[in-house]
Amino acid sequence: MKEYAFGIDLGGTTAKVGLFTTSGALLEKWEVPTDTSNAGEHILENLADAIHAKMAEKEITSEQVEGVGIGVPGPVLDSRVVPIICANLGGWGERNVSAQLSGLLDGMKVLVGNDANVAALGEIWMGTAKGCRSAVMVTLGTGVGGGVIVNGKVIDGAHGAGGEIGHITVNRHETAACGCGKHGCLEQYSSATGVVRCMKKLLDENPDADCVLRGKDFEAKDVFDAARSGDALAAREVDEMTDTLGMALATIANTTDPEMFLIGGGVARAGDVLFDPLVEHFKTYAFKSCRETPIKAASLGNDAGIYGAVRLIVEE
């Protein structure tokens, strides 16, 4: 094993890049703007330039670098983005990211994974789930992302769509469409935007109910804060949200039986007001032998992606 490795978490606005030792020590991290012009044609060139510049700065040679891991916001199969457009990367279509980036890096080894799966891999390597062989990570942000690790390996699936937890159907009677085009996806209820949408719906359906959020612009954090303070309508929304999420996690537990669930993203910062009812609802729906599966907050935060990307390289 060589001395260094690079990890990249590619997002629509910036790419987070980390220089690591191959034992997992983060030496330095920085960001590279994501150039989405011309259908994202310059994204990989810019990343290669950034890595070359850092190697020159640190006097690191190619012979000292084990490789580069990269998490991308789209389905990945066999180190290749499958033919689904990544809209937040300027409309990236099918491309062999591994081969293209490797070519720009003078033949350096490059491995690619879905960003949510890679973040889960980071948590199981150096985060909350360190020491676990199997874990499921659910990220509650603008959407709901997911990563499934079984026996230390990312489950990409036959079509690169493994871990699309946010698009589990939890309400077949929903009339509003999810961003994916389906109806009744978990993301519509348990993401930050979903919590706000459902809270607004509750306010409309209960015009006479007192609520500190009525008549205000609010975010998901405000809903959880109101519930913590004893607001009955906000508490009802949190109960419904955690019931839906608990049912989805129980479905996953009943099929993959992980050692641990990890909850990340901005919503996870709600703390006990989220986790306490979530655990109780999960136990209601889970198969008996899975009911005590721990549900914990992820710990690596925004660095999970770069840790997991490096893990792709060093576990090879």
Tell me the role of every PLM-derived stretch.
Residues 81-93:
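A charged helix-plus-loop insertion that forms the helical arch/lid used to bind
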Residues 93-100, 166, 170:
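Short, acidic/small-residue loops that bind anionic groups at enzyme active sites
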Residues 30-32, 87, 158:
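Short hydrophobic alpha-helix segments
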Residues 120-125, 146-148, 167-168:
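Adenylate-forming
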Residues 112-121:
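A glycine-rich, Thr/Ser-enriched phosphate-binding loop motif common to dinucleotide/cofactor-binding enzymes
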